[in-house]
Regions:
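Short, charged alpha-helical motifs in flexible N/C-terminal segments and linkers
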Residues: 1-8
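Low-complexity, small/polar and acidic-rich linker and loop segments
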Residues: 10-18, 22-26, 30-35
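Charged, flexible boundary elements
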Residues: 34-67
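RNase H-like nuclease fold core
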Residues: 54-58, 62-128
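Helix/loop segments that flank and initiate small ligand/metal-binding modules
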Residues: 55, 63-80, 84, 203-252
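Acidic, His- and aromatic-enriched active-site or binding-groove loops in soluble protein domains
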Residues: 195-197
Length: 252
């Protein structure tokens, strides 16, 4: 009889620096989708092909959006990934909040987490109207498509619904990266600077662990092909030596 997957891969999880308690347990959403408020998403700038559109055109259209939502409080979010390090940031006026995620997190998760940080800004602000700018189309598509398989999308939609009921009106707007939009550049710089921060403790979905397990299996197979060298006799298995030397977060 085959053991459950969680039991079957428990050894692999430990080999890549995780415990079963570090992984988010899948669960059915507590709030039915039909009770969640669908976020307002503006994809106006996505209608233009970035490769064939000069940055000045994007900046001009961005200013048009800002003029359209002139009385809205502007917030910019971004995520960054460099090597194994992952971080998220939110920027509004002269304020910045950054978080470094566990190294196994994906850039997609970082972008979503940045949007959750933005929810904290909305919650604590005295303003009631907000326009949130992000260059992550995949995050907006997941939120707009009610991708409830993602724990972060679930949390975002719950927060959005609660805040909307409390009079907080938010519009999510996609903007292209690297075209000279100041707020986006500040958020990008903040996210990259956060890569040097200590890791914030948080659980990750199993999908965030699978790539590490896959790499471990591949490295092990390559290492086993070197059975004739002396080092292999001293260290017969690869494990995740580098990961063991780093400060891996432990789930609270």
């Amino acid at each position: 009889m085959l053991p459950p997957l969680a039991v079957h891969i428990s050894g692999d999880l430990q080999a890549v620096g995780f415990k079963k308690s570090d992984v988010i347990t899948s669960s059915i959403p507590t709030t039915p989708p039909w009770l969640l408020t669908r976020p307002a998403v503006n994809l106006t700038l996505h209608c233009s092909d970035k490769s064939n559109t000069p940055p000045e055109i994007f900046k001009h259209r961005f200013y048009e959006i800002c003029h359209e939502f002139n009385n809205y409080y502007r917030i910019f979010t971004d995520g960054a990934k460099e090597g194994n390090r992952v971080a998220a940031a939110v920027v509004h006026r002269d304020n910045t909040k950054c978080v470094r995620l566990p190294d196994a997190a994906s850039i997609f998760r970082a972008e979503l987490y940045a949007l959750l940080l933005e929810r904290d800004v909305v919650r604590s602000s005295k303003e009631n109207n907000f326009v949130i700018f992000t260059d992550s189309m995949s995050s907006l598509q997941s939120i707009n498509g009610f991708n409830l398989d993602s724990d972060l999308v679930q949390k975002f939609l719950k927060d959005y619904t609660v805040l909307a009921k409390n009079g907080k009106n938010s519009i999510l707007c996609w903007i292209p990266s690297l075209v000279g939009i100041l707020g986006n550049e500040k958020a990008d710089a903040a996210a990259k600077s956060a890569l040097s921060l200590p890791v914030t403790r948080m659980k990750l979905p199993a999908t965030g662990v699978y790539p590490r397990i896959t790499k471990l299996i591949f490295d092990e197979e390559v290492w086993n092909c070197c059975a004739g060298n002396k080092l292999h006799a001293i260290r017969p298995t690869v494990g995740d030596y580098k990961q063991k030397t780093e400060n891996m977060p432990i789930a609270p």
